[in-house]
Every structure is written in C-alpha cells, then in structure tokens.
Amino acid sequence: MSFKILKNNCCGLDVHKTWIYACIGITDSLKRTEYKEALFSSFTKGLNELCYWLSKYNCTDVCMESTGKYWIPVFNVLDKNNIWVTLSHPKYTKPQKGNKTDRKDAKWICDLYMCGMVKPSFIPPADIRELRDLVRYRFKLTCMITGEKNRAHNCLTVSNLKLDDVFSDIFGKSSRSITEQILQHPGEVFDVAPFVDSRCKTPIEEIQAAVDGAISHEQAVKLRQCLKHIDELEMHKAEIEREIFRLSQKYESVLDLIRTIPGFDKNPLTAIQVLSEIGADMSVFPTAKNLVSWAGCCPRNDQSSRKIKSTRISRAGSYFKPVLVQVANALIKSKKHPEFTTRYRRIKARRGHKKAIIAICRMILTAIWHILTDLKPYTPEGFLESRPVNKEKVLTISQALNLIKQRGYIIKDDVGPVCLLYTSPSPRDCS
C-alpha cells in the first residue's frame, strides 16, 4: 500500500451467511506488512474460534461490512470479548472491479482499515439496539394493519356496502357491529338502529340505505379473515408496545427532555422512536450538523468539474425521517410556535413545501442535539434570535431617484412643479 499505515495490527472480515473470511495485517517497524488469513463458520462455535484466533495474534481492531443482518451476531460475540469492531457501509469499502474473491475482499477491507480510509457507522449501545428493533417492528405491524384495513375496505366496496360514506371510521364501534351482523346473516335485511351508537351524527335512514347491498360468500370469507387478522395484529402491537415502554423506563429523564420539544408531547411513543434511532449519548455526533447529515436531512455533495450533479437529500434515516416529517407537518399548522411556522413560510415561498418541511426537520434535529448535549429543556429563544440588521447603505441622488422610480412613486416638490418619473433617474418632463 502506498498510503500511510495508521494501524499496525488490524483485521478485515468478509461476513457471509455461512462463512466468515478473516485477514489480519501485521506491520513491523520497517513498514512491511504480513497477512494472516483464515476461514471460520458463522455458527457460535466458529465465532468463538475467530475470537481465539484474533487473540493469538494480539489483534483487537476489527473492521467488517454491514451485510444485512449477518453482521449482528458477529458484532455481539466480538464485542463481548473486548474487541473493538468498526462497522462500515459497503459503499465505503467497495473493492476494485475484476479479479474478485471473498479472501481478496477481506484483505481489501483490512488494507483500507489499516490506512484509516474506512468511514465507521454509528452503532448504539445494546439496549438501544434492542429498543430500536422493537420500535421498527411496531412500525411494520402498523403497516400490516393498514394493509388489512384496505383489503377489508375493498371487500365492502365490491359488495356495495357504503359504510365509509356514513361513518368516519368503518372500524369503529358502530360500523364494526353492523359488519359483524352482515357476516353472521349474509343477504338478510335487518334494522341497523340497535347497532348504532347514540353519539352517531348520521341519520339512521342513511345508514340503513348504505347497508342495502349483497355480499357474496367469497367476499364474506375474505372480509372475515381480514377482520380476524386485524384483531390479532392489534393484540401483537399492544404487547410490543408494553415491552417498548418497559425497555425505555431507564431513559425516562431523557424522554422527558425530548418531550419538551413541540410536537413530541402528544404521543409518548414519538419520543421513544427518536431515542431508539439516535440514542441518548450525543458525544458520537460532534456537532448538530453531523446528526442532521446522519439522519439524511441535509443536501448531498455531488460535484464534478464545477458541475453540481445532485443536491437531493440522501436515503439515510428511512425509519427516522418519517417521524420527523410527521412532527414537522403538525408544527407548521400550529399558531403557538412561530419559530417553526415563520421559517416554513419563508422557505416555502422560495423552494416549495417539500424542501421547507425538510428544513423544519433540520430545526427539530438541531434542537434535539442541543437538548441532549446540554441536558436542558427546549426553549424557542434560540430560533427567535433577531437577525443582524444590515448597515446603512449610501446611495447617490441618481440611485435614489432610480429606486423611487422602480417603486412607482411620484415626486412632488413643495414649491415647484410636479415631476413624473418613469424612464430615467433624472426628471425630464416637468409640468
């Protein structure tokens, strides 16, 4: 390698589903590097053998790619054996094209790590990783529930049962009771009045007309399974939420600080989602800009030959950004927080809604970083600081007259005639 060697003893791992290719690079005082290669199984026994092999060569620095979920058990075993693991995105350790093998990939990762050319990924503590896994699984359950509700809605639409026209929520108490009655007695006409709650604003006559449809046997079977699956998913989601609240109890003080930010005090799970993604220790992000960049809420740098190819935000934070956007969309509609609404309107007028919303997300992330760094509650003063006023500008008489002309003003002398200014800085036509 022609680059400067920063680590004299390190290891590169090429992790696969069944096998792990390892390569240790040992550099002596004369800058000569000797490589040791080995192949290990991804079973627990093979991971323990990997730890023993690393200790044999006194290697405590390991670098590997984040390949799917296969890196997680390897990381856990190495971390328990006091081995420092650097996890990197595959795009930062991409090998040269041609003549590629797994052993050469491990050696390439070792060489990059040896020369300090690997960009490490953010790995939160173990308890935060467990919390993140449950929070993301809850999000998947929510998506599954939404999908099943759409299928149930389609069954009612195909059968010409217009419950969505008379109820705001077809899965509410009254609508669900009517749906169950239809499934128990398909094709029969019944009175809907006993199933409608007294607080329902829709007249009984309209509801009776909305259920004047016929559901087929096939659609009834499908609708029954959809409703049953929705109930099961809701039960699983409630159990996951109980476990999420249990795991987040030790971070209650941090969550209270996050909930002082506008938009995070309505739903207690919103603050937990933020905690599960970024953790409670902000020392891993030197500045608020680093956190914003990690979350994918800032423009990219993609420039070549003085041409800017793209300034779009990155695809990072696929689970984190939707939460921030949801909070930002709620904040811009509130009149209680002018620090957000004023900035949103100013940017929207120039750049549009989408870019303005991402700017509000950046403001929220900046506030989160400062709150968790200083351990102080949110205050809007930081965003409401007055901008520095420009110094007095000096204009010549012709410049001042030209400016007044552009604004459409008419200059009238106190004693002289009236001058109309339209085409030039100095008056020509006087009357």
Language-model segments: which ranges?
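Short, solvent-exposed helix-loop connector elements
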Residues: 119-136, 163-166, 218-221, 305-313, ...
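Single conserved hydrophobic/aromatic residue that forms the stacking wall/gate
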Residues: 422-431
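Short helix-capping/linker segments at secondary-structure and domain boundaries
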Residues: 117-119, 148, 185-188, 237-241, ...
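Acidic, Ser/Thr-rich low-complexity intrinsically disordered segments
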Residues: 400-421
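Phosphate- and other anionic-substrate recognition elements at nucleic-acid/protein interfaces
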Residues: 1-209
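Helix-hairpin-helix/helix-loop-helix acidic hairpins
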Residues: 208-269
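Phosphate-backbone recognition surface of nucleic-acid-processing proteins
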Residues: 97, 256-260, 272-354
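Basic, amphipathic alpha-helical segments enriched in Lys/Arg and hydrophobic/aromatic residues
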Residues: 348-403
